[in-house]
């Protein structure tokens, strides 16, 4: 597990002791800041040594190490305390600033933290804008790219849709469709046919057998009768033509 930077945690917390607020001033603000429950206070600082030896704060200038000083005071609301590294009586390195507003202590962010926060905020905004834009982008091979917004969908839903008129087919279209259906019927003949609506489909072979005419059987007596009639007609010969009267 990665180690957590304590300084980053201190930027997001605050500390307050309500019992000190009524008596808080320029002379007591450092004592208030040096409370044991204050997470911003470093107990290895020179202020703690001076406090234990009951010396004045002027002795801090003669010491080397971490110390806290009152940088600015605007009683009774605002106090600014600086944490610094003293290397000599005339040389110090600022480490952090703390501001007290109405008794509540906060750590002031350093320049790097401010820039980092601003950059992250800007990048997050740009990324959100790109994500939002990509959600409205559409693509189709035949149309290409276009924008599709939800407002257009709502307007299309509210707008009454015109009923599309069905155009009648032309004679050429009907003839062409009939020719295609006939061609398909010849290539793929049906195996079952429904003779009448509602009846059970019947195989095509069975319908062909029923459609074939049954040969009639002629009795021998009827054959002889027809022969005699034919002979009688042939014996008489053709009827004579009557002469026209002039």
From Swiss-Prot:
Region forming the signal peptide: none
One Gene Ontology biological process: regulation of transcription by RNA polymerase II
UniProt subcellular location: Nucleus
InterPro entries: Mediator_Med6 (IPR007018), Mediator_Med6_met/pln (IPR016820), Mediator_Med6_sf (IPR038566)
Predominant localisation class: nucleus
Ranges of biased composition (kind: Basic and acidic residues): 206-226
Glycyl lysine isopeptide (Lys-Gly) (interchain with G-Cter in SUMO2), cross-linked positions: 208
Residues modified as N6-acetyllysine: 236, 241
Positions of the UniProt region annotated as Disordered: 193-246
GO molecular function per UniProt: transcription coregulator activity
Keyword tags: Acetylation, Activator, Isopeptide bond, Nucleus, Transcription, Transcription regulation, Ubl conjugation
GO-annotated cellular components: mediator complex
Self-association state and partner proteins as the record states: Component of the Mediator complex, which is composed of MED1, MED4, MED6, MED7, MED8, MED9, MED10, MED11, MED12, MED13, MED13L, MED14, MED15, MED16, MED17, MED18, MED19, MED20, MED21, MED22, MED23, MED24, MED25, MED26, MED27, MED29, MED30, MED31, CCNC, CDK8 and CDC2L6/CDK11. The MED12, MED13, CCNC and CDK8 subunits form a distinct module termed the CDK8 module. Mediator containing the CDK8 module is less active than Mediator lacking this module in supporting transcriptional activation.
Family, similarity comment: Belongs to the Mediator complex subunit 6 family.
Coiled coil: none
Stated role: Component of the Mediator complex, a coactivator involved in the regulated transcription of nearly all RNA polymerase II-dependent genes. Mediator functions as a bridge to convey information from gene-specific regulatory proteins to the basal RNA polymerase II transcription machinery. Mediator is recruited to promoters by direct interactions with regulatory proteins and serves as a scaffold for the assembly of a functional preinitiation complex with RNA polymerase II and the general transcription factors.
Name listed for the protein in its UniProt record: Mediator of RNA polymerase II transcription subunit 6
Pfam family for this entry, one: Med6
